[in-house]
């Protein structure tokens, strides 16, 4: 571009000094390494608050804004008091103050707000020299981890896992098919069948845990403190239902530490016509590297060997099942049927144990069991039987009369009349 052309462009772009000023042929090293100017708005996301620092030269034009024209968030929080000589304006607010919005994502907690510059006329003037501006602000905090800058003392598991242990443990008790491959779709049984139960805890990101069935009770309603009731598991994991004529037992080995499977021979309560039961179990967990003991065990009774045996752990932890005293009395969640309410247990985390219920289990009577119930046939069945017998009698009578008429007709034949011989 020649001098004339350059001068012509300068007139068109009057005030564009960058284009019209002469450019040196050398490279100024001091300009290259000069530190860049800090941003006009800086945000510091602290543990419990956010600190916003605003340069009074917000627009970079050299014209300073007034602190009174700045607010933070939907609640229009005002800045901290500062001297007129300060070159910055500061805000310091809590994460849940000033109308800050919290959003929860898969990996982070996001607190969002905005810085508002809303200029107002100064004095009696009705003019503005700066524009209205809104600057969005966000603070991201990871959901997994410690946001404090102070060192933490480790608990029995890492800090991150302790939080999960209080939020992510989900206990369940389900009816399973005989081969344990899937959940049983229909809760119907016949007396003499065997119910396959699977207790499980979903640990999420927790450290590995081992699940135990501490206590189980069968009742006619989901309220396991009502009568009648039948104890299936007692004494911190002793499957006492196997002591009777039943073959109830825990399945060994486990498929996984967080799963415990066991079978119960189905039954119904005598002198009750509902033919259904609910099973409520108290489940709890321990770290998987903890050796089972008398308070945390799964023991079954073998009639062939006449002794108790654990699913895992030392054999002697099941000896207390025969005595009915395992560990310190009152430590387990046991039902006080006299008082009709559960006895509370002292525990460190509420979510390390839970009460879960499955049911109703519905029992269908077998066809050959009707005669065993005694002479209690219902009147509709009697009337139906009499009606069928009457119909069959009338049908046989009609058949006999029809055959008799045909035999008489055959003994006296009628000859057809011929037109001519």
Swiss-Prot record:
The chain crosses the membrane at residues 382-402. InterPro entries: ZP-C (IPR055355), ZP-C_dom (IPR042235), ZP-N (IPR055356), ZP_chr (IPR048290), ZP_dom (IPR001507), ZP_dom_CS (IPR017977). Expressed in oocytes. It is found in: Cell membrane. Keywords: Cell membrane, Cleavage on pair of basic residues, Disulfide bond, Extracellular matrix, Fertilization, Glycoprotein, Membrane, Pyrrolidone carboxylic acid, Receptor, Secreted, Signal, Transmembrane, Transmembrane helix. Residues 23-381 are extracellular. Residues 347-421 form a propeptide. Residues 44-306 form the ZP domain. GO terms for molecular function: acrosin binding; carbohydrate binding; receptor ligand activity; structural constituent of egg coat. Disulfide bonds join 45-139, 77-98, 216-281, 238-299. PROSITE patterns: ZP_1 (PS00682), ZP_2 (PS51034). It is a single-pass type I membrane protein. One of its GO terms (biological process) is positive regulation of acrosomal vesicle exocytosis. Residues 1-22 form the signal peptide. The modification Pyrrolidone carboxylic acid is found at residue 23. Component of the zona pellucida, an extracellular matrix surrounding oocytes which mediates sperm binding, induction of the acrosome reaction and prevents post-fertilization polyspermy. The zona pellucida is composed of 3 to 4 glycoproteins, ZP1, ZP2, ZP3, and ZP4. ZP3 is essential for sperm binding and zona matrix formation. The ZP domain is involved in the polymerization of the ZP proteins to form the zona pellucida. Polymers of ZP2 and ZP3 organized into long filaments cross-linked by ZP1 homodimers. Interacts with ZP1 and ZP2. This is Zona pellucida sperm-binding protein 3. It comes from Bos taurus (Bovine).
